[in-house]
Amino acid sequence: MSYGYDDEDAKRKKRYVIISISSVLLISMVVAVTIGVSVNKSDNAGDEEITTSVKAIKDVCAPTDYKETCEDTLRKDAKDTSDPLELVKTAFNATMKQISDVAKKSQTMIELQKDPRAKMALDQCKELMDYAIGELSKSFEELGKFEFHKVDEALVKLRIWLSATISHEQTCLDGFQGTQGNAGETIKKALKTAVQLTHNGLAMVTEMSNYLGQMQIPEMNSRRLLSQEFPSWMDARARRLLNAPMSEVKPDIVVAQDGSGQYKTINEALNFVPKKKNTTFVVHIKEGIYKEYVQVNRSMTHLVFIGDGPDKTVISGSKSYKDGITTYKTATVAIVGDHFIAKNIAFENTAGAIKHQAVAIRVLADESIFYNCKFDGYQDTLYAHSHRQFYRDCTISGTIDFLFGDAAAVFQNCTLLVRKPLLNQACPITAHGRKDPRESTGFVLQGCTIVGEPDYLAVKEQSKTYLGRPWKEYSRTIIMNTFIPDFVPPEGWQPWLGEFGLNTLFYSEVQNTGPGAAITKRVTWPGIKKLSDEEILKFTPAQYIQGDAWIPGKGVPYILGLFSGNGSTNSTVTGSSLSSNTTESSDSPSTVVTPSTSPPAGHLGSPSDTPSSVVSPSTSLPAGQLGAPPATPSMVVSPSTSPPAGHLGSPSDTPSSLVSPSTSPPAGHLGSPSDTPSSVVTPSASPSTSPSASPSVSPSAFPSASPSASPSASPSVSPSASPSASPQSSIG
């Protein structure tokens, strides 16, 4: 088979380079998830003969940030072999034993701890390292069936895995914020080499991706268009269920509090979910408020939750950081099993603003979909932790950093509902946590609407709403074709703490509308980007999260590309009968559409119909779609000024209900600010926490291996209401 090159030797060399780099990369990944790996240097290193293996390792380590760690680690067990497969086998076997030993030591540390929060943090680390090992196993298998013409797909998966591993490591360390004793320092030292090796592995795969992109090999760079196909893991029965009206659905299990199903609680039902199956398993959760804490474990893949509507089926909890629980562990619902789908359900945390960080849902599942769902909380409501996620026609409510995490997530036609925070707290909406510039993660808000509850609108002058702030150094958020109300101040974005992340973040606004959409007075940090047409395309669902391979076929309205102008699109809408016969705007993608005073009628879908819902669909979805949103919301909160017509979803017509954010920092962050707007609270361990110390590496440099350089674990410091005040860390 020809790959576009005449020289057979050149082809052979390129193939060898790819296999070699992939193999050594895997070794790095294996070692990276090992806590306490030791790097032993040879006493006679000066006399060591430079072998073929050493030369190969030096070449592979060239693009990394921590070259010495890279070379020393790979040479430790490589001996004189230069066979990539043997290197992989040796490293894999040695690492599995190392991880087993570390697990035993971690358990011993847990048993010796007197501080309950420290015990919880150690348990959290143990869980997260286990997830990383699971990802490694899948990667090892993927590499075992290596196919040259599919290497680009393999690289995408490896980048996703490495990005998630960085998130796991950082979340482990974040859990020790506010703990007593030396457990946190012990784990930080043990993880130092692992953190460095993970960043090194990501550097290798990124370098390889760039190299392959320049090669322009047709067989590798061509991708099948899957918009008319169903994902490989979606069986025919599941497709029928997801596209059928609820009255016709015959789920595998029914949960009903009134006794009309097989089980009365969700956790009872989960005991009967098949483990590690490749077929979809559907759970119908009937109307009711389910006060239980639910975790969809890693083994529960291809699971579907279908409710009776986000105003009827509610999963409710109230755990909070203030109660002595790590932010990670406060989640009412945790989704870990890949290929998860939820429709017509509400997830809530009722702890309130006074309790600081309190997560309604934490999502780690790759290729997860949420349609017509509601996420209610205050600080840190939706924890989009890691991997690829897609949200359509959902409502997310909160005060501070209520959309945070390090996932690659697209929110299409969703409503961001700002709630009343504590006194003098500002309300930053997003707090993305990217730690490495090479991570394939970030938040994309496409065709969304920002609105406020009436209680918030009453204090919007004192508590401003911001589009977001940088939780970690390389925070990335793109907002496009979205309605931005008047309670978002002209500066738009809020700093985390001082100058932290302002040079290295990646924020961009594209063709937004509404009275707060003008960018002429936005902050001018080095990290604010003006994207070209070509660059914008990279952040659409089809390219950014490879959505064409797994979103179509679910009955979920899905726009795979760009909207034209203020919400119109010439892209295909798959999985629904919604039309996209709108004209293309001549505006440049980086141009802001002149804000209109009312939200556009005809947004592509609407959020849930619960009292806090904000948008009601102007266009009804066809019966039988995956949880088509109810047509009549019981209560509508709409923007004070309406967004331009043509948005992907429009708020209700009642302008008075739209609440604009105030300048105060969000209530409930770990370390809520004092009543004085200018006061700054030290960041806590939660997701949006401000840095505990100045980063050891300049923001413009690559992330330091030392965990202490990053901001606190979760947004735990509430931002001050005053724009001039340094925001306090609030994710924690």
UniProtKB/Swiss-Prot annotation:
Additional notes on this entry: The PMEI region may act as an autoinhibitory domain and prevent untimely PME activity during transport.
Site (Transition state stabilizer) location in chain: 379
Family matches, as Pfam families: Pectinesterase (PF01095), PMEI (PF04043)
UniProt keyword Membrane present: yes
Residues modified by glycosylation: 40, 93, 278, 297, 413, 566, 570, 581
Functional note: Acts in the modification of cell walls via demethylesterification of cell wall pectin.
UniProt source species: Arabidopsis thaliana
Entry GO MF terms: enzyme inhibitor activity; pectinesterase activity
Region (Pectinesterase 28): 252-548
Name of the protein in its database record: Putative pectinesterase/pectinesterase inhibitor 28
Gene field: PME28
Keyword Calcium: no
Localization per record: Membrane
